[in-house]
Amino acid sequence: IKGEPDASSFPSGGLRATFEARGYTAWDPTSYAFIKDKTLCIPTAFCSYGGEALDKKTPLLRSMEALNKQALRILRLFGNTDVKCVRTSVGPEQEYFLVDKDMYEKRKDLMFTGRTLFGAKPPKGQELDDHYFGVIPPRVAAYMADLNEELWKLGILAKTEHNEVAPAQHELAPIYTTTNIATDHNQLTMELMKKVARRHGLVCLLHEKPFAGVNGSGKHNNWSLSTDTGVNLLEPGDTPHENAQFLVFLCAV
């Protein structure tokens, strides 16, 4: 399945000749299609007339193939001929802040930039563990439950949610999956986090540092290499031979 949309504005407008301005979309069959707002959405790669990548999915798929090729070469040196494919996997932990919508609308800096640009320090920050190890507030718990259901509808395996270190900070962790699928899922997750928050009178902030003086929001990737036979190449082995293989891949990474 291939499309031919206009690509004259990619990577930026006016840099490419008119006869080379068309682009090509190609379906990424390894990433699941999904229905959003009565529209069938098909994950695609986007390339130029000359084959240059115009998106971020194409370089990712190429890097995954390069890793697969070189990892198989190393496995063959260790005498492993059973493995046919090596895949990278990611389980991105998405951290975020939740702010009351009424309070949010009183701060123009939050509305325009997604973070605070000025203001006094709060009387209490994250010095104590009353938030991190505290009970999830009912309003936030209702948001998390609603978000989980919306994510499951799209096949996104949201698994864990909990409070984070900073006040009003929380985290969502899905079950890990193949890198390109996990990347697509994370984009959908961030979109839905903002959308669902509005239903509960909240605003979801995904900026990496929305408030000074407290922790920002990270996104731990939990990246690894796995074979099609179910072996995690970044897991230490039980024998010296298996440890040698593990150390080679660890040093390569």
Where are these regions (language model features)?
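Glycine-rich, acidic/polar active-site loops that bind/position phosphate-bearing ligands
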Residues: 1-206, 211-253
